[in-house]
Amino acid sequence: MSSVTTPAPVYTWTADEAIKFLKEWNFSLGIILLFITVILQFGYTSRSMFVYVIKMIILWLMWPLTIILTIFNCVYALNNVYLGFSIVFTIVAIIMWIVYFVNSIRLFIRTGSWWSFNPETNNLMCIDMKGRMYVRPIIEDYHTLTVTIIRGHLYMQGIKLGTGYSLSDLPAYVTVAKVSHLLTYKRGFLDKIGDTSGFAVYVKSKVGNYRLPSTQKGSGLDTALLRNNI
């Protein structure tokens, strides 16, 4: 005698249950969305580096969460049409995630900075101050870059980098590293304001496929930009 298997019951969400869920979780969801909105709105390197790092973490988590949700949609698709769209979205999300990692690794090889894995931009401005390389992200590669020193505090494009510097410490060149090439900016103007303050304007002068010069003494690489075929 063969046993008859009964199909598992399909649970459906009623409108009343949905309204009840929103009433119970509305306050928490509102606080979470408000927190994310404030972080995304005010997370800039020129304002607060701590808030900016939190913003980068949120943006970085968006990709794996998107992939998880699209895979979930594939497993629990409502019909074949939803399944087809879910498969396409999953493939696109995974490909873009892989491309992000490939570009970030290439940029890391070029600069050696963990800012290369910034999900917001692939532009890293770099300045060598007395053998110390400062690397920070910028949204785009501008035609000019401004470096300011205010009472020994070093700022580049409004982003504070360090202290204990003077105008005489400013290099002749700064760079903006991208995935496929390196932009070189030449100092075109320097003005001193008072005894310990001033600024310099750097103008884009050369574009090439290079990596950052080494700052290690004795390597023979301090004054040259090296060819990089990646």
From Swiss-Prot:
Residues 1-24, 77-84 are virion surface. Keywords: Glycoprotein, Host Golgi apparatus, Host membrane, Host-virus interaction, Membrane, Transmembrane, Transmembrane helix, Viral envelope protein, Viral immunoevasion, Viral matrix protein, Virion. It is a multi-pass membrane protein. It comes from the Viruses. Residues 46-55, 106-228 are intravirion. InterPro entries: M_CoV, M_HCoV-like. It is found in: Virion membrane; Host Golgi apparatus membrane. One of its GO terms (cellular component) is membrane. GO terms for molecular function: structural constituent of virion. The chain crosses the membrane at residues 25-45, 56-76, 85-105. Pfam families: CoV_M (PF01635). Component of the viral envelope that plays a central role in virus morphogenesis and assembly via its interactions with other viral proteins. Belongs to the betacoronaviruses M protein family. Homomultimer. Interacts with envelope E protein in the budding compartment of the host cell, which is located between endoplasmic reticulum and the Golgi complex. Forms a complex with HE and S proteins. Interacts with nucleocapsid N protein. This interaction probably participates in RNA packaging into the virus. This is Membrane protein.
